[in-house]
Amino acid sequence: MLYGIDISSNQGKIDFNRVKNAGVEFIIIRTTTKNQNPDVRLGEYVKGCCEFEIPFAFYKYMYALSPDGARTEAKAVVSTLNTIGVLPSKSIVVYADVEDKTQFALSTPALTLVVQAFKEEILSSGYSFGLYMSKSPYETKEVDYTLFNDKIWLARYPFTTARGLKDVPNDTYKPKAKNGELVGWQHSSKGIVSGINGYVDLDVFYGDMTIGEVSPSYYATPEFTLIECLNKIGVYPSMETRKRIAIANNIPNYTGTKEQNLLMLALLKDGKLKTA
């Protein structure tokens, strides 16, 4: 059993070093907002997970009321992940978060078609799919769970008081997957974890989670210095090394100026930086 959290920009600035030391073993991160824009801290959170080798997955809180709307939401998620360098991989799971009241106003067949459309788009883009719901609407078949033989992540909060990361309720409260595999249980929305200000959702997952990877181009963002980028792609960033790289990339008289470093970062982002 792994102890983890799920987060969005509501958690604000996170100290990932403290989070890691607190025992967090995985993090599930919100991808996009209602208007399909990236969560404003998505890149920052992915960076933190990568730096401290915390396995991660993603979720999309769904609002779509039609299959076409679901495909639009899924495409926005895929585009966002590609933009930050989280390239398609079956080790990267995107969970459809189905809990909005407007969706539950749909009939079960209609909402099932919505979720199926989202799933198909995620899978066809090369990622893995999972379904997140609260226990009650899942069991009452707001979505026809018999059609989702997938990773199932269910929410059930037995207690309303603040909880520590490893204060997991006993298994008598654990929800059950009616179909597919119960991979995770969100057991509290009032978690207290070092490194996070305020409450955070607490989860336990069963089995292993892969440490996610991002492409080298992700590191060529304003959040990273050239030295950090070179370290991330396994190149020792001494001044002599950077001078050699500059020569190889036709950047003359390298002295480490901002302009020269930005040129290298641009080449790295485009996958054109020669490092030898």
Tell what function each PLM region has.
Residues P88-D171:
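Catalytic domains of cell-wall/extracellular-matrix polysaccharide-remodeling enzymes
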Residues S215-Y236:
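Extracytoplasmic/periplasm-facing segments of secreted or lipoprotein envelope proteins
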Residues G207-A220, K272-A276:
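Low-complexity, Pro/Thr/Ser/Gly/Ala-rich linker/spacer regions in secreted
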Residues M1-K119, L123-G126:
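Substrate-binding cleft of extracellular glycoside hydrolase catalytic domains
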Residues M1-S9, L147-V214:
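Functionally critical loop-and-helix segments that line ligand-binding/catalytic clefts
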Residues T241-L273:
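Short, Lys/Arg-enriched alpha-helical microdomains
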